[in-house]
């Protein structure tokens, strides 16, 4: 399980981090302790004296030089001096007892593979645990995890069992203890004497007893679905009377039977027959499954009634009868609810289809108002075809319903014939098989009708989606036009243009129209017609001042042109000519009429300083015209797409 797979990972995670470093420290500490012990054991007093003497005799550069005295200098050894052998042996022993030099430290390993392995195990563990959590939360991921991941099913089962035991802690304490059934207080049942097993071999019973038992069993085996209500009531009344008479005779002669001696040679008397239990009858049990269940239950009741100890089964049989009646009522309620739900869904679908058809016709009438006369006949013909198709479909459904009702009645008659004529079972089975094949063929036809309806629904859905997309594109165009024409100041319309582009995704005409717009136009906005007209007035005054300037004018020419522009007479709007004043007057008149395109064309005919001064104004007007032209192209494309929908 999951524990067996996670335990090695935990050991790998715990061993290198928790055990390696202390072991290294302990090994190093042990080595240092051993080295210290060896040094302590090998250092002699003479070595300590020499070490301390040399340490005290050592002088650093920062220390002051000790003053030299006139003391005697040590005598240097001469070649003639002799060394005693005891000193040489002691020095050799001291040198041999010195500890060896510590080994060089091994190069430290980088541990990249170990870190990679640790990170890989951690990542795998977290991913596996997260996958188990997702498998417990989501059914789709549960199927994928348990089918394709190793040990996935065992892990999920383990955690599900833990969750179950956490929710139900008492489930393990009494796993086999069942809740005690309520004790039914019924009538006391008296078991007649000698009704059980005995040591004596059973002898042949009398012929009349056998005939009575066979007749009773045969009458009890008749099912309620085959017999009529009057016959079933008569059988029940007869069984009750026989039971009452048998009980009275049994109560009247208990003492005589007890006093009379039992003879082993005479044949045994047949057991007293028990009372007949009433068969189950359902008023609304027209379902095949319910009828089969009632037949099976009545067969069981008949067998129990034929037994001599049927009284002790009366209470459970009555309880089971009540449960079966409740089940039959629930099945009838569920069938009626399902039938009502299906009818409501069918009505909703019809209403939706009718509403969609009306909406589509209304849109077609709005778009094709100019061609209403030519297409009216086709529209009427299509509507008649649809009505005829719906009428044929309704007639087909009614015919199918009638055939199903007739088939149900025929099946009931066949079942009754089966119950009355058991010797023709084989022929009845063949008939049922043929009827089953007929049902399968009708199911195939119904499936074909459903597929055709799905295709029709998909077609209507495509038409509705296309019209909805066209309406959304038109709304987006209106939003862009509102931002462009009704804004008091130039506003960027990037979001509106992006919405138009997303709605017309895949349309080359719309994308080309949007690409033709200058980026600065939708990033900074474009002026409205009023702003263009106001700016034209300011530009016109500057152009009039420079209208008399030649191309190579100087300061004097500028001053003269400024003075003469004040005394120039304005011309009429209908005046013709290529001079600056005539062009400005015609442009102003066109702007007042709202014809920005013609006004821009007039201003574009200027030359020299007048054209240079009006260059910025012409650039803004060009951006406005580009945006308007693009919007007109997109709107025309949207209308064309709407006309293409069939």
UniProtKB/Swiss-Prot annotation:
Residues 1-61 form a transit peptide. Residues 66-87 have a biased composition (Low complexity). It comes from the Eukaryota. Its main location: mitochondrion. GO terms for cellular component: MICOS complex. Component of the mitochondrial contact site and cristae organizing system (MICOS) complex. PANTHER family: MICOS COMPLEX SUBUNIT MIC60, MITOFILIN. This is MICOS complex subunit mic60. It comes from Penicillium rubens (strain ATCC 28089 / DSM 1075 / NRRL 1951 / Wisconsin 54-1255) (Penicillium chrysogenum). The gene is mic60.
